[in-house]
Structure formats: C-alpha cells, structure tokens
C-alpha cells in the first residue's frame, strides 16, 4: 500500500485553464532557457582561465539481509510499505539496534578505500523535515565517523595516475522514497513508499581534489569497482543502491581561495555526472564573466534538457542541528576486529591488474577490461591457467565473445559459449587447427542455436589447410587468372598482396592457414 500526500487545488474549468496556462508558460520557459544556453556557451579561451574544484558525495546501500537498526528485510522491489516496523517509521518508544553486518561491511569498504578506521565512532541525529522521513531525523554520523583520510588512484589524461583523497566514510540510514508520477492523481498527490527507510548506507565523501568532469568519472568508476570487489554493495544505480551528489565551484587559475559551490543532485549515472559537471562549470563561469555572483545552492540535473536548475539554498551543517543519538552507544571497534576485516579483503582491482599484466603478458587496456568485474576476472584466470596461450583467451573474451554479448545486452554468464569452450577455441587457434574466420563462423552458430562451442566444433569439424603444396597450387591458379594485378604488384603496388590473399582464401573456402598463406603469396609474387 502506498501512502499519499495531497498537494493539489480544487478542480473545475478555472483549475483546468490555470493548469493549461502553467504548462504553456513552462514550455515557453524551457525554450527560452535552451536558447539562452546556446547563446551563452563559454569559449575555450575563457574556460582555460578557470579551474574547477569538484568534490563528490556517494551514498552506497549495503548488501545486508536486514536494515541497519531493525530486523525488517532490506530488499528492493517489495510491495510498497510492507518492509516497515515501528523502528523504521519512528513510532514513539521504538528503539534502534545496530546491525553488526552493516558495521562489518562499512569497515571492509573503509579499508579497501585506504581509510583510517576509528576504534570509537558516534552516531548522531541529523534533523530535517521531508515527507519520506517520518521520524523527522536521520540517524547518521557527524564529527566522529567510522573512517577518515582515505584515497583512490585514478588514471589521468596524460597517462599517469592521480590520488583523490577521501575525507570520510560514515554510516547512516536511508530515507523513504517519494513517488511523484505514475498514478491517475499524480498531478495532485505524491505517494510515499517507506520500505527504504532504515536501509543501511555508507556515505563516502571525497576531498575537493577533482579538477575535471573526466576525473570525476574515473573516480566513480574506480570506487564502484572497489566496492563490487569487496561485495559490500551491488552498486546498482537503477535501483538506487549507489547515488552521487556533486559539489562544484570554479576559481581563476592560481587563486588560493575556493569559489562558491553548488551541489548537484538527481544524477543517476556516471555519464550524467560528467555531463552535469560540464554544464555546471560553464554556468558558473558564465555568471562570473558577466560580473555576477554564484549563489550557494542545491541544483537538480535534468538529463532530458541537459541542464541544472535551482532546487533550494544549500544547507550548512548547523542547519541540521546534529546531536549525539541518545538511543545508541558509541561504536567501539577493537584493533583485532579491524585487523580481521583487513585480512578478509580480496585482491583489489588495481593490484590485480598489475599482477595480471605481468603474469599473463596482457596489455594495460585488456587488463582493465578483464578486471572491471571481479567475477569476470575470476573466470578469465581460471581459463588462463588451463589454456596454452592466456593472451588468446583474453582476445576471445574481449573481442569475439564480448562484442557479441554487448550487442545483445548480455552478461558473460549468459553466454551460450562456456569458459571451457573459450579455452578450446583459443587452443585450436594456437595450434593452427582453425583460422580466426572459422572460429567466428563457429561462434555465429553457437549464438544462433544457443549451443556451446565444443559441441558445435565436434559437429562441424572445420579443417584448416596447412599443406604448403596445396596452398601453392591455389596461389598459382589465382596468379595465372590475374596477370594484370601481378604486373601492377611487381611494378610497385605492394598493397595488391591483400587482393591475392583474399582470392586464395575464397578459393580455399576460408580454410587456408592465414599466416602460411601470406608468407607463400609474398614469396610467389616476388619470385
């Protein structure tokens, strides 16, 4: 059952005309804004005068079975307002009890992000009013969070790395969800689903070390990878288990003082974070260049219009009237507990990349692709240990198999071709028993008939011609049939070698060994 909040006016013809007028005004306003945006684009020379300063606040839902302060299910997609209890919705006399698994996950995340974990942290009440926060306050942490002083390394455009600091990681509970559309009376009512109230969160606050939208994108990408490797969250942005707010200001390059910041909310993808920051940086520079003053405020990102718009003035910490949560004691973590969690950390993405580059002789690009998911990295390594050439396995996974899966919107675990099939294909290529073209044809059959590669290979049994005399015979026939091209080649048009290779490959029905064929064609044409 959804709870509704009435927010409309009486009906009737006057009301309809009023609302129609509002819609027309809104449409005109959008058109005017778009024209203004197009007219006030900031030139590259002006952009180069300023330095953006960006900090990100990332809220991450933890994958606990139950909520942070009660025993209600922590489950996305349940019927509205079914996973709630007196603690979730703040009924008088209901007391919170801290979820130990949430503490473990927050500690793991902190250590994976190179943070210093506090042995003593304190929960606090963050007081504010919003319809989907029925208690009127949120249990969070303020001046004594569970962890501080972390960092993540991100790649730079110049090919190096940059360290982005993490100010703090703290624990808190999530609020409910306001639903503003999708109902027949959405024009006059907002519906509330309180299932999300009490969902365990960590908020990860970066230092203002980020200088470009691209750096912000890389920071979020690396952060998500690390959290997924530790299995503390599924980081599903569509379901709201990873949400990002961006704080951004601009200042003249070399200026010691920070500019006035704006907070950008409602950004539900890493791509939109980058686009929102690009827009907001230009908006603030445009204001300053026009002699105006940037206002400290919270702004919402509108992806369809490609712009931010003002939501409210930006709150300061004192606006929330933080005070220690009286119903929860301080959180005490022993050195032994912290050491135990550190020992439980898996090999993290960056360390794994470096090892795999060295161990399997992979390119940096391939190593990044294969380690972007812990599960896919595990699958690759298991296959690489049994294959004759691990690099062939990597090439097949990334190019041949990955390309097909991406086109179909499938994950690796949904592929009709198993990892054993990938290893067989790699070994057949390595031994020269099939060509790349033959493998592609077999893969096409696998996807068309939803069969694994070993079964398709056994049935089709393609053979590669590796007999030198057989290939030379085909080359002689092609040369005899194309005297004009032979003359052009010998006159200096060496690119025609590809023509002869193609003709022989066609004559062999794709079965000639490519490396041997190229060698013999060149030898014959040069003789």
Q: PLM features: what roles do these ranges have?
A:
Residues 33, 37-347, 358, 364, ...:
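Basic, nucleic-acid-interacting segments
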Residues 240-252, 358-379, 391-407, 448, ...:
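Core structural elements
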Residues 366, 379, 389-397, 421, ...:
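Residue-level detector of well-ordered alpha-helical segments, enriched
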Residues 495-527:
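Short, amphipathic C-terminal "tail helix"
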Residues 386-387, 393, 401-416, 424-429, ...:
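M16/insulysin-pitrilysin zinc metalloprotease superfamily fold
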Residues 1-5, 16-39:
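N-terminal mitochondrial targeting presequence
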């Amino acid at each position: 059952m959804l709870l509704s909040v009435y927010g409309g006016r009486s009906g009737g013809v006057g009301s309809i005309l009023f609302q129609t007028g509002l819609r027309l005004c809104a449409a005109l306003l959008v058109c005017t804004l778009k024209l203004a945006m197009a007219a006030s684009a900031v030139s590259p020379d002006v952009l180069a005068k300023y330095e953006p300063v960006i900090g990100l606040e990332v809220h991450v839902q933890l994958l606990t079975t139950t909520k942070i302060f009660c025993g209600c299910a922590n489950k996305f997609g349940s019927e509205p307002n079914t996973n709630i209890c007196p603690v979730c919705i703040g009924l008088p006399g209901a007391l919170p009890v801290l979820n130990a698994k949430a503490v473990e996950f927050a500690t793991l995340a902190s250590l994976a992000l190179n943070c210093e974990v506090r042995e003593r942290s304190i929960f606090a009440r963050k007081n504010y009013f919003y319809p989907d926060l029925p208690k009127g306050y949120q249990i969070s942490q303020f001046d004594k969070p569970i962890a501080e002083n972390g960092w993540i390394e991100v790649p730079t455009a110049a090919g190096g790395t940059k360290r982005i600091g993490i100010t703090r990681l703290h624990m808190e509970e999530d609020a409910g969800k306001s639903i503003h559309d999708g109902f027949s009376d959405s024009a006059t009512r907002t519906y509330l689903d309180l299932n999300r109230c009490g969902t365990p969160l960590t908020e990860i606050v970066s230092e203002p070390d980020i200088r470009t939208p691209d750096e912000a994108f890389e920071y979020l990408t690396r952060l998500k990878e690390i959290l997924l490797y530790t299995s503390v969250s599924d980081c599903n942005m569509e379901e709201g288990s990873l949400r990002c707010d961006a704080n951004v200001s601009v200042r003249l390059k070399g200026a010691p003082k920070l500019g006035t910041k704006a907070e950008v909310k409602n950004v539900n993808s890493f791509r939109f974070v980058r686009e929102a920051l690009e827009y907001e940086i230009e908006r603030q520079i445009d204001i300053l260049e026009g002699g105006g003053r940037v206002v400290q405020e919270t702004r919402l990102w509108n992806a369809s219009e490609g712009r931010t718009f003002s939501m409210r003035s930006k709150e300061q910490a004192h606006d929330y009237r933080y005070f220690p949560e009286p119903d929860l004691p301080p959180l005490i973590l022993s050195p032994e507990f912290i050491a135990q969690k550190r020992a439980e950390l898996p090999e993290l993405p960056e360390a794994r990349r470096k090892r795999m580059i060295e161990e399997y002789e992979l390119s940096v690009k391939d190593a990044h692709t294969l380690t972007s998911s812990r599960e896919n990295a595990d699958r690759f390594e298991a296959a690489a240990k049994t294959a004759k050439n691990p690099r062939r396995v990597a090439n097949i996974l990334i190019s041949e198999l990955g390309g097909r899966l991406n086109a179909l919107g499938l994950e690796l675990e949904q592929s009709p071709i198993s990892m054993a099939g990938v290893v067989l294909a790699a070994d057949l290529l390595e031994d020269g028993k099939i060509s790349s073209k033959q493998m592609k044809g077999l893969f096409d059959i696998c996807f068309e008939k939803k069969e694994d590669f070993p079964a398709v290979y056994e049935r089709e049994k393609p053979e590669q011609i590796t007999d030198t005399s057989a290939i030379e015979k085909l080359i002689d026939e092609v040369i005899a049939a194309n005297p004009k091209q032979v003359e052009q080649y010998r006159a200096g048009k060496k690119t025609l070698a590809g023509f002869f290779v193609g003709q022989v490959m066609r004559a062999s029905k794709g079965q000639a060994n490519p490396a041997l064929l190229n060698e013999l064609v060149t030898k014959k044409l040069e003789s």
